[in-house]
Amino acid sequence: MAFEEMIKKALDESRNNCRLGDTLEEVQEIQNYIKNAEKIYIPNKNGIKVDVLNKVLREYNLPSAKILQINTNEADSNRSPAFAKAIMALDVCDADLIIARGRLGLPGSGSLLLFVDNKGRILTCGTSPSHAISQKTLEDAVYELSLIHI
């Protein structure tokens, strides 16, 4: 099943009150979308997250992501800063895939790593607790979170 057809089918099921949850086929379509992405961007103002995410992308034989050097501080005033970063990136580049990481919500709420398609739809994501609790370095937190979702 093609990616867009899979989305339409799931929406039709929801509309018709017969959706029973995600299927393995849907998960595989999302994985295929990620694996077939050619233009991958990471909105960030420094390269630390980009270096770590590119290490993971290489481990899965995926193309390297490019840093999209935009000031994402404004995203922190949003209710969902990580998603706001992804949308900011889509507004300024022609990407197949955006990988954005930022605060989950309120200060202290933890971090959210998002994989977003070229239409701003969340493909997958992962959360991690605040660094104040986990005591993990930025590099370790990003690496561990991204491994799970590719």
Residue ranges and their predicted role:
Residues K55-A65:
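Short helix-loop-beta junction
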Residues N71-D94:
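Short, solvent-exposed, polar/charged sequence segments at loop or secondary-structure edges
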Residues L90-L106:
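A short, hydrophobic beta-strand-centered structural micro-motif
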Residues I148-I150:
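Conserved small/polar residues in nucleotide/adenosyl-binding loops
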Residues L20-K35:
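A short, basic/flexible loop-to-alpha-helix module at the beginning of a structural domain
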